[in-house]
Every structure is written in C-alpha cells, then in structure tokens.
Amino acid sequence: MEEKDKVVVEFNQDNLDRFLNEYYKTHRKGKKPIVESPMSRSLNKMLVITNRIVQNAHKQNMKAYTCFVVKDLGLENLGISSANLNVHFVFPTKIRHDLDNFLGGCKEQVDGFSEIGLIVDDDYSHIHTISSSAEYIKGETKMIFTFSNCKFDLEELKEVQAKEKIRKEKRDESMAEKKTVSKKK
C-alpha cells in the first residue's frame, strides 16, 4: 500500500446524497433522513438529546455515513498509526458558529474512522494534535478531515481489530444472556 504524507476525507452534500440513496434501497420505510447534513452535529445539539437510545441511533447513523465515505474513497484499512488532524468546516451561511462545539461533534466521525480502519485508534498516542479551521462559502456545507505527517502500521491495525472483534462478541453474548434472563422472568 502506498504511504502518503496527507490523507484527506471530505464530507459533502454529494457523498451524503449517495449514502442516503444506498441506505434507502434497503430501508424503504424510512421517511426522515438518518443523517441531515455532511457537517458534524454541534455539541449543543448532541447534549440536548437526553434519550440514550436516540443518541446512540444518531451516533450509529453518522458512523455508517463515515464508513460509506471512507470506503468510497478507498481508504478503509489504511491503518494510520500516527498523525496530526485538521478539521476544516465550510459553513453555508454567515450565522455565528462556535468551532469548539462542532469540533466536539466530530467524535462520531472519528469513531467511524477507527471502526473502518482508516486510523488504528483515536487515542492521543495515534492522533497527536487536533486543530480546526473554518470558512464561509455561500450555500455550501462540507467538512474536510486532513491527516498529516502520517505513519502507517497494518500489523497494529490487525491486532486492534482482532481485540475489538473479541470484545464485540463478548458484548453481544452478554446482551443475549440478559435478554434470555429477562424473558424467563
């Protein structure tokens, strides 16, 4: 695999539309878009939702969108093991936006990057710095993640994915046991 100094992942209206198109081919009953914007949700919007089930649904939908974009770009299982990250926001209006709120909302995308193997893990030993920038372009909404000074480690990625698979199997097994116990009552 060719190593790159920079890896760029862009979330825009085009790839959001294609994701939703694919999603609704298999989920025909859905009426409301499961992801409303290529932009991350503001922390203010995330924290207002107190229902954990709704919060988790938002997180899972954004993770699915993130995985779609990464696969579309051919970057799955890239295994970035060391990098700096810049998140660039393009806002469609001149309404005031707090970057810290939007940067905090990027957690859902970064979790998706880990799950699909673009990055080995999202901890501080793999992502050393996170910075943000923004601009206004009338009518355009997008978010661009740029990983720079990248180092890659496919062996570490495989180890982390194997551990995560075991952890997921144990979690699923535990959930199945809890359902069985609750049905017996």
Locations of regions flagged by a protein language model:
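Catalytic phosphate/metal-binding cores of nucleic-acid and nucleotide-processing enzymes, i.e., regions
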Residues: 1-185
